[in-house]
């Protein structure tokens, strides 16, 4: 696996912020209502930007959210099957989207893409991309 460095992480972060803005712009192209954006900070580390559209012409509600959070320890549930992650700090960043259309014949859409990095002082970071996409009947 290729090693990851601070420049790579910043490049992914900027890409994800652009992705959030591009998705919001695309939704606004078809729905006349405005997104309300709210920046937030996480006490344990990191933060993000929540983007919400409500009561639009096409969509009942859309959320397009960016987060970049960090922490000192991974929970046991995350390390039980991956012992190489035990004792590592972490950083996770991503974009998640949920679209609830007004049309009952159009499915609800959920998607997310994320970068996860587990850091150790004594060895290179362990990192991977994850995500998913699903459509649920209204």
How would you label these PLM feature ranges?
Residues 4-83:
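Gly/Pro-rich turn-and-neighbor structural signature
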Residues 50-128:
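Internal mixed beta-strand/loop scaffold within catalytic domains of large alpha/beta enzymes
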Residues 130-132:
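Long amphipathic alpha-helical segments with strong coiled-coil/leucine-zipper propensity
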């Amino acid at each position: 696996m290729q090693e990851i460095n601070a420049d790579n992480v910043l490049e992914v972060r900027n890409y994800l912020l652009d992705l959030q803005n591009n998705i919001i712009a695309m939704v606004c192209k078809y729905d006349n209502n405005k997104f309300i954006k709210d920046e937030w900070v996480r006490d344990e580390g990191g933060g993000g930007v929540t983007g919400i559209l409500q009561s639009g012409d096409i969509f009942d509600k859309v959320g397009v959210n960016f987060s970049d959070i960090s922490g000192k320890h991974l929970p046991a549930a995350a390390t039980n099957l991956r012992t190489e992650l035990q004792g590592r700090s972490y950083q996770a960043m991503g974009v998640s989207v949920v679209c609830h259309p007004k049309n009952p014949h159009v499915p609800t859409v959920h998607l997310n893409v994320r970068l996860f990095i587990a850091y150790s002082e004594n060895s290179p970071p362990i990192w991977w991309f994850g995500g998913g996409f699903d459509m649920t009947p209204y």
